[in-house]
Amino acid sequence: MSDPGFHPESPEPDSLREDQQTLEPVRQALRAYGFWAYGTIDESNRWSIAVDDELGRADVRIGQDGYEIELRAVSPGLYAEEDSPWRRQARTRLARMQIPRVSRGYLQPHQVAIWDEEMEGVGVIETVEMPFQRGEDIPAFVRQRLPRIEELVTMIERELG
């Protein structure tokens, strides 16, 4: 008889539980540091700890050899003040084409610039891995990196004109 808690389209329940247990100390450390941190299942059906901050977002997951930390900053509404919908759409399309070229000079291999459709602005995503034994360093790392990622977003926006 099969386990009633098992759903083929979902990750193995045991794996999710293990990841949740492994990530719980990270969630607690982030909260103790003043972040709003919570556990959730991400878009790839992996357990992660999500952090929402005024400067950006962070997601912490179990990576290949440690904690995978994805940091993201987005500047919303780059062309929101553009009155003409046609002109706003044209500028958005041009920004999507220019972002990869413009970002080459600013970003490291573990960083990527995007056009965020939901927020209608430039975003930068940085993905790094931190060893399991350095889990207590994650809150300070997130606090240090989010402003720097926000600076990258601003530089890319400036280049887009």
Model-found features: residue ranges?
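Mixed-charge, glycine-accented linear interaction segment located at domain edges/termini
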Residues: 140, 144-161
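Short, internal acidic amphipathic alpha-helical interface segments
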Residues: 74-125
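A short acidic/glycine-rich loop-to-helix N-cap element
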Residues: 129-144
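Secondary-structure transition/turn motif
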Residues: 50-55, 71-78, 127-131
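Charge-rich, low-complexity N-terminal segments
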Residues: 1-68, 109
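A short amphipathic beta-strand at an alpha->beta junction
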Residues: 12, 18-20, 98, 157-161
